[in-house]
């Protein structure tokens, strides 16, 4: 039952006290005995249910079983609670819940004395033997109680398993009296007061006495006293009978304590008198004054004359001793003053001789060591105001003599300057000593300042580490470092890298894609590594028609129409160097600039699409209209003619930014040869496009790089077909 406050607060208080009593700062598995006794008082006072107290100790065992020292201190605390907390707590300790946890989990799993790992560790072996000794001791203490027989059964079970229990030297002295502890009694219920026998009602309410557990009215239970014998240190309600018993117990103890204090005070007075008498005798012997024989106090003196005589004798002896001690003290003081004066005179004479003999001597005089007194440390004499004024005046005059040549001769023979020189020269040694002293002090203060700064820095680092450990101010994710782009990646891409992407990528980058360089963070679209944007060279002036060429004759329009046909740069077979020559071929070709400041580069389809060249360029775009990159091989096919002869033009696909990709390691070694063999040459494509009689191109805003003609060497070039040139229209 919970009498004082809420049970949760009491539980927290008990857990904290258990943790402090078995703190890890206590060495060798010992206990903090005052805190441990507070734990036992808290359990014995029944402020918490006994099962809750047992579970608090069990929880502490579970928290400390991996540390042998903490486990030893916790086991000792459990043993102390068993011997001081009463029968209500023993019933919970002897339960199956606690004993099985102690024996089956802590002992047999972690500290089994039969295990070779435990035997190799001295600390674990000591803990295992401590558990066995405690179980054996508890079984002896609980042998006379049938309610606590489960501990005895656990002991017998371990004994049958051939565990060696330690022997006790005083086993016969252990009995049930070690666990007999006075605890608060259980409450008794009744309908009337046990003193006045008045029945309880709405007005006359009943109250329980914490000392005896009886029921009493307000009149006979209005007393509040602490019950220390029951482990209750706070004032609690008690009846009149229990109050009278408590007072009767305290009276003889107070009487005994008062008589004992009187006896001790008398003994102390006698001892002081004896010590004073001995001191007086010793002092009189030193001064060679005759000492009168001490008068024995034990002799019976009935007359008043003997008392006065002894008092007078004591007074005379005391006065003589005081006078002798004062005389010795005065002599010692006089001798000390004379020695001090003599030493000061010697130091002044020595210092004066050093100044007169050599004022360049910078050594500070060291006082001689005297056996009778400590050496006197002389402070460095500072300059007076007059001396400083003389020095400043001398410096000013000498400065004027050096700078002004007209008055230099007159000033050099001036008597005042000569007098100042005689005054200033003896001060040189004093100034030098002051300078040396100041420099030493400055060095000392600098060292102290450095030490204080170092200590402050170490303290701040220690405080920061503690704050980080406490509040978790730790950087969980390291800062993202952008990959550096080397010179190889910054250089211009080869024609191979511009025209053929990595295998498995057959579509361009979308227009809404933000390049990683604009955001500052690396992005990896499609699971590929980011490739920095390559610089694109300017297109030659003859590669695209200008605005002036568009206004010329219709004959020139036909030529411009031929030059605006999308052409594809097929690298020759010999332009693909081996793996070691990639860096040399990086700067062979350059891309021309695209119209409208947009980079729209078309690349070859992936390897798996060579069998079907009419596959869409952007397989993932379902909403856009699909186009064929190359026209069909048959120049005279009806499907291609119908497609190009239709009056309505198909919508132009929006331009997309192209991500330049480096050559993938998965590209077949003969991919270029296969591509040039499967696809027709560029001349055939131009002729087929001219025969289609279509006035517009599918991609008017797209231009493709044209490789140099001297490097293009197709393997098999089909014969060209003759196509008649259409006649120009006559304007009417």
UniProtKB/Swiss-Prot annotation:
Compositional bias (Polar residues): 253-266, 492-501, 596-612
Zn-finger segments (FYVE-type): 187-247
Amino acids binding Zn(2+) 1: 193, 196, 217, 220
Pfam family, one: FYVE
Keyword Flavoprotein: no
Keywords carried by this UniProt record: Endosome, Membrane, Metal-binding, Repeat, Zinc, Zinc-finger
Ranges of biased composition (kind: Low complexity): 502-513, 520-542
PROSITE patterns assigned: UIM, VHS, ZF_FYVE
GO CC terms of this entry: endosome membrane; ESCRT-0 complex
Similarity remark: Belongs to the VPS27 family.
Function field: Component of the ESCRT-0 complex which is the sorting receptor for ubiquitinated cargo proteins at the multivesicular body (MVB) and recruits ESCRT-I to the MVB outer membrane.
Assembly, per entry: Component of the ESCRT-0 complex composed of HSE1 and VPS27.
Comment field on protein domains: The FYVE domain is involved in the binding to phosphatidylinositol 3-phosphate (PtdIns(3)P) which is required for the association to endosomal membranes. Both IUM domains are necessary for efficient binding to ubiquitin.
PANTHER family: VACUOLAR PROTEIN SORTING-ASSOCIATED PROTEIN 27
Stated name of the protein: Vacuolar protein sorting-associated protein 27
Organism per entry: Scheffersomyces stipitis (strain ATCC 58785 / CBS 6054 / NBRC 10063 / NRRL Y-11545)
């Amino acid at each position: 039952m919970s009498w004082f406050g809420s049970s949760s607060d009491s539980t927290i208080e008990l857990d904290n006290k258990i943790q402090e009593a078995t703190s890890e700062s206590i060495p060798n598995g010992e206990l903090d005995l005052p805190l441990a006794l507070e734990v036992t008082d808290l359990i014995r006072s029944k402020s918490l249910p006994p099962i809750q107290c047992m579970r608090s100790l069990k929880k502490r065992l579970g928290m400390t079983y991996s540390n042998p020292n903490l486990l030893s201190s916790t086991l000792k605390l459990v043993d102390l609670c068993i011997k001081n907390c009463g029968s209500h707590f023993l019933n919970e300790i002897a339960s199956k819940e606690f004993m099985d946890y102690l024996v089956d989990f802590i002992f047999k799993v972690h500290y089994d004395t039969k295990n070779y790992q435990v035997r190799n560790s001295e600390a674990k072996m000591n803990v295992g033997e401590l558990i066995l000794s405690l179980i054996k001791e508890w079984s002896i203490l609980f042998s006379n109680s049938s309610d606590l027989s489960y501990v005895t059964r656990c002991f017998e079970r371990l004994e049958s398993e051939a565990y060696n229990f330690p022997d006790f030297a005083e086993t016969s002295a252990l009995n049930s009296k070690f666990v007999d502890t006075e605890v608060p009694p259980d409450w008794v219920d009744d309908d009337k007061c046990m003193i006045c026998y008045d029945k309880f009602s709405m007005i006359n309410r009943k109250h329980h006495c914490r000392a005896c557990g009886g029921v009493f009215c307000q009149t006979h239970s209005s007393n509040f006293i602490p019950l220390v014998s029951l482990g209750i240190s706070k004032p609690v309600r008690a009846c009149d009978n229990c109050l009278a018993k408590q007072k009767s117990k305290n009276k003889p103890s107070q009487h005994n304590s008062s008589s004992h204090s009187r006896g001790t005070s008398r003994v102390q007075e006698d001892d002081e008198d004896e010590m004073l008498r001995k001191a007086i005798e010793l002092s009189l012997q030193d001064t060679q004054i005759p000492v009168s024989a001490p008068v024995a106090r034990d002799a019976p003196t009935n007359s008043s004359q003997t008392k006065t005589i002894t008092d007078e004798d004591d007074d005379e002896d005391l006065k003589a001793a005081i006078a002798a001690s004062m005389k010795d003290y005065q002599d010692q003081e006089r001798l000390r003053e004379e020695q001090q004066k003599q030493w000061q005179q010697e130091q002044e004479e020595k210092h004066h001789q050093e100044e007169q003999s050599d004022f360049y001597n910078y050594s500070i005089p060291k006082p001689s060591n005297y056996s009778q007194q400590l050496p006197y440390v002389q402070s460095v004499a500072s300059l007076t105001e007059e001396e400083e004024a003389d020095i400043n005046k001398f410096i000013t005059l000498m400065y004027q003599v050096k700078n002004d040549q007209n008055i230099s001769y007159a000033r050099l023979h001036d008597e005042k300057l000569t007098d100042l020189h005689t005054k200033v020269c003896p001060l040189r040694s004093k100034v030098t000593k002051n300078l040396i002293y100041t420099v030493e002090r400055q060095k000392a203060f600098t060292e102290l300042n450095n030490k204080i700064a170092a200590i402050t820095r170490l303290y701040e680092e220690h405080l920061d580490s503690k704050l980080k450990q406490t509040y978790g101010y730790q950087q969980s994710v390291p800062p993202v470092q952008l990959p550096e782009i080397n010179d190889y990646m910054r250089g211009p891409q080869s024609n191979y890298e511009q025209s053929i992407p990595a295998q498995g990528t057959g579509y361009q980058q979308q227009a809404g894609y933000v390049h990683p360089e604009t955001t500052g963070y690396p992005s990896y679209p499609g699971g590929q590594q980011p490739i920095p944007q390559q610089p694109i060279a300017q297109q030659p002036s003859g590669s695209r028609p200008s605005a002036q060429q568009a206004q010329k004759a219709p004959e020139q329009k036909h030529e411009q129409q031929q030059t605006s046909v999308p052409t594809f740069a097929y690298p020759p077979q010999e332009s693909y160097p081996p793996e070691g020559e990639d860096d040399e071929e990086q700067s062979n070709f350059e891309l021309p600039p695209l119209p409208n400041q947009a980079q729209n580069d078309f690349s070859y389809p992936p390897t798996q699409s060579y069998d079907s060249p009419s596959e869409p360029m952007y397989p993932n775009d379902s909403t856009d209209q699909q186009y064929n990159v190359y026209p069909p091989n048959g120049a005279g096919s009806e499907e291609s003619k119908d497609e190009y002869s239709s009056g309505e033009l198909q919508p132009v696909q929006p331009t997309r930014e192209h991500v330049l990709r480096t050559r993938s390691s998965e590209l077949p070694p003969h991919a270029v040869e296969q591509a040039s063999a499967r696809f027709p040459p560029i001349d055939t494509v131009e002729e087929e496009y001219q025969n289609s009689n279509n006035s517009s191109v599918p991609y008017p805003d797209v231009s493709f790089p044209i490789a140099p003609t001297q490097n293009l060497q197709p393997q098999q070039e089909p014969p060209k077909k003759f196509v008649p040139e259409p006649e120009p229209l006559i304007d009417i």
